[in-house]
Amino acid sequence: MLCSVIQRQTREVSNTMSLDSYYLGFDLSTQQLKCLAINQDLKIVHSETVEFEKDLPHYHTKKGVYIHGDTIECPVAMWLEALDLVLSKYREAKFPLNKVMAVSGSCQQHGSVYWSSQAESLLEQLNKKPEKDLLHYVSSVAFARQTAPNWQDHSTAKQCQEFEECIGGPEKMAQLTGSRAHFRFTGPQILKIAQLEPEAYEKTKTISLVSNFLTSILVGHLVELEEADACGMNLYDIRERKFSDELLHLIDSSSKDKTIRQKLMRAPMKNLIAGTICKYFIEKYGFNTNCKVSPMTGDNLATICSLPLRKNDVLVSLGTSTTVLLVTDKYHPSPNYHLFIHPTLPNHYMGMICYCNGSLARERIRDELNKERENNYEKTNDWTLFNQAVLDDSESSENELGVYFPLGEIVPSVKAINKRVIFNPKTGMIEREVAKFKDKRHDAKNIVESQALSCRVRISPLLSDSNASSQQRLNEDTIVKFDYDESPLRDYLNKRPERTFFVGGASKNDAIVKKFAQVIGATKGNFRLETPNSCALGGCYKAMWSLLYDSNKIAVPFDKFLNDNFPWHVMESISDVDNENWDRYNSKIVPLSELEKTLI
């Protein structure tokens, strides 16, 4: 039934477009530029990639960047050359670029490009018949700096402190901009350049993020910042939807040049379409003369556009680290996570929570279990014992809790520590710390449960009331504190996501995913899929919907469009809704709060 409905809806969308129409999604990441193509049925039909270190070795980057101590940057010219190269690959493959109706994409977040006063006139050359490559027209004189800070840069501790002092601390910074001040965020990076490179800063007429840099190249003129990506700058007042006067003044006060607002082109764009692709790409590569460019956005923002995520849906990426993305209509910021304006849903936000200790912490427990098994010392990558322990309910661990942080953790913000405790299930209070549990196998279950429970309690303030309730006898008036949030336990007992989507390497592990699903407690299903192209694919979907919506061919919002037309056959439905197990973990919320208090 579901398949027939989806097929009918897909045909309806297909009927609004010409046959054999295509949509491109770029992914300009740190190490490569990928370009993905889908057809009108949302099927991936072609892909090309340029790996910077391998395909453009003359830039002498290491994994796409230059590293000088804490300063990590990328050569901007390399991106221009990569764009020509990836489109040349499409041309060589005889892909019909003349049937591409729209393009969009994803770019590494936070990086900044510093255009000179000559940039606009040089970009105008892209609207004439091309005779040479991009680097000839958009030459080095187009830029006041030849490199762009990369998100891995951590040289701005001083500037982050100045930012937070300007606003009144990390909590007020998060309230204003959606995040506390971070090394990689664009505002502190701009401030550093204004302070340490005054000549380059004064030569800068316009500052772009990587996203609107690429959009500008494609349309042949400078375009404003894309609003969702601008939320990763520590400069944008999200509630007021404008740049913060105080933070712009901080940058202006550090330079003779008092024009930061003008450099940022005054305000981000809110348009679905930035313009038509410029003549350079039409003449050189055969693009359709009416091909539209939807503004590029940031990589994490494009990721949520690659899946049919609606309000109260959660995406859990289980990799070396754990990242949780969710769609919410609640603006509830915290210094320990990030909030961005949603790139395609008005009046919605993307929440992002990043944990440092993910797979590596679990692997340590796995290895310890394997070393105890006879003749298995060499098979430390075998998950059999670990998985059996995670799913084994024969031995109760209901009064046990542990945190396993072999590395310093981001959420909560603490140094490396492992700690195991026994708690009173009736009160939730910690009774004692223990060096080990009665069975080492309990560590496997407890590490997965505590990781999942941390995700659950931290997404709770961003979820709508789901009318959930606990069957356990708990004191719902107990005040629970996680990070900067302090509220009664009842506030954590009536919030559940609708759907949870699992991606990443560890999502292939059935035991880990099942336990995460039990703890998080989605009410309308749990799903798993592989997403090697998520950023570029999100760009494809954004391009397609933006064109159709802007041209009045469809009237549905992005989330409904993607839910109706998503290729659900690539998605695996896993782990049925489990109300009983979700309720079981309610008794561990207070103990987790109490345990985290002892870590600070």
From Swiss-Prot:
Origin: domain of life: Eukaryota
UniProt keyword annotation of Secreted present: no
GO MF annotations in UniProt: ATP binding; D-xylulokinase activity
BP-aspect Gene Ontology terms: D-xylose metabolic process; xylulose catabolic process; xylulose metabolic process
Top enzyme class: transferase
InterPro entries: ATPase_NBD (IPR043129), D-XK_euk (IPR042024), FGGY_C (IPR018485), FGGY_N (IPR018484)
Gene inactivation effect: Impairs growth in culture media with D-xylulose as the sole carbon source.
Catalytically driven reaction(s): D-xylulose + ATP = D-xylulose 5-phosphate + ADP + H(+)
Positions bound to ATP: G358, G505, A506, S507, K508, N509
Residues holding substrate: W79, L80, E81, A82, D299
Modified sites of kind Phosphoserine: S244
EC number: 2.7.1.17
Subcellular location: Cytoplasm
GO cellular component, one term: cytoplasm
Keyword DNA-binding: no
Keywords carried by this UniProt record: ATP-binding, Carbohydrate metabolism, Cytoplasm, Kinase, Nucleotide-binding, Phosphoprotein, Transferase, Xylose metabolism
Function of the molecule: Xylulose kinase necessary for growth in culture media with D-xylulose as the solecarbon source.
Miscellaneous: Present with 3460 molecules/cell in log phase SD medium.
Family named by the database record: Belongs to the FGGY kinase family.
Protein name listed in UniProt: Xylulose kinase
Originating species: Saccharomyces cerevisiae (strain ATCC 204508 / S288c) (Baker's yeast)
